[in-house]
Every structure is written in C-alpha cells, then in structure tokens.
From Swiss-Prot:
Belongs to the RimP family. Gene3D superfamilies: Ribosome maturation factor RimP, C-terminal domain (2.30.30.180), RimP-like superfamily, N-terminal (3.30.300.70). Keywords: Cytoplasm, Ribosome biogenesis. Required for maturation of 30S ribosomal subunits. InterPro entries: Ribosome_maturation_RimP, RimP_C, RimP_C_sf, RimP_N, RimP_N_sf. It comes from the Bacteria. GO terms for biological process: ribosomal small subunit assembly; translation. One of its GO terms (cellular component) is cytosol. It comes from Pseudomonas putida (strain GB-1). This is Ribosome maturation factor RimP. Pfam families: DUF150_C, RimP_N. The gene is rimP.
Length: 152
C-alpha cells in the first residue's frame, strides 16, 4: 500500500466507522488531471444511497480540512458490489473458495493477471489456483483484486 493510500486510510476509516459502517477499502486513482478517490463502505444488510450520502458528506468535510490531496479529484462512495474488490488478507481469507481476478503491480512468473479459484491466504501471500497450478502472490504485489460474481 502506498504512503498516500495509508494516509487516506488512516484519515477516512475512523470517519466511516464512526458513522456505523465498515470501511471495506479505499482506492486512489490518479490519471493526470482527473483523479478519483473511492471509499467502499459496507454494513450488515447492505448499503443504501443514503448511507453513501452520509459518508460522502462527512468524508468531504474531513478532506476539506486536512487537504491530503493537493490536486483536483472526484470523491466516490459506494458499496463493494457483487464484484467486490479485495484489499486485506482478512478479506481474501473470508472469500476463499470463490473465483477472483487479480492484477499485480509487476509481473510474477512472467504474468501480471491471474484469474482463478481463491484458495485462501498463507502468511502474507494470497493463494490462487489457475487451472491446476497454485500461485502464492504476495499481498503487497497486488494492484487490484475482485471477486468474480457467480450466477449459479
């Protein structure tokens, strides 16, 4: 996790949790002049638009005061959704047995993209099975990971 992301997590997670929600994760995507700060929230029973609104108002107020991002950005607050992103070892462990798509920051064994069965975690590694081969991917090397929804 980058230091900017760690700073944003430390600043915003207490705000989200203080409102009674779980801070599922935070993404900061900087693309030239257009940057996006995404806060994913969750709670028992699911998230409503009003929940996102409440978190957005509080997060905006804190971000305006603390000003951790010097450039312009768009703030988005949403539920993790069906294809929920995975950020922590605990989240990977709790979704063992599901199909995932993982993108790494840099190639591992000649590839950056892995799609397969999430087997779980071992220490600081995420274990994913692609076809009949298991890969142990260091959590710090993962750029993006999402559950692949099953419509069985």
């Amino acid at each position: 996790m980058s230091s900017k992301l760690e700073q944003l997590q430390a600043l915003l997670a207490p705000v989200v949790e203080g409102l009674g929600y779980q801070c599922w994760g935070i993404e900061y995507v900087s693309q030239g002049k257009h940057s996006v700060l995404r806060i994913y929230i969750d709670k028992e029973g699911g998230i409503l638009v009003e929940d996102c609104e409440a978190v957005s108002r509080q997060a905006s107020a804190i971000l305006d005061v603390e000003d951790p991002i010097s450039s312009e950005y768009t703030l988005e607050v949403s539920s993790p959704g069906m294809d929920r992103p995975l950020f922590t070892l605990e989240q990977f462990a709790s979704h063992a047995g599901e199909q995932v798509k993982i993108k790494l920051r840099s190639p591992f064994e000649g590839r950056r993209n892995f799609q397969g069965l999430l087997r779980g975690v071992e220490e600081q590694d995420v274990v994913v099975q692609v076809d009949n081969q298991e890969f142990l991917l260091p959590i710090d090397s993962i750029d993006k990971a999402n559950i692949i929804p099953s419509f069985d």
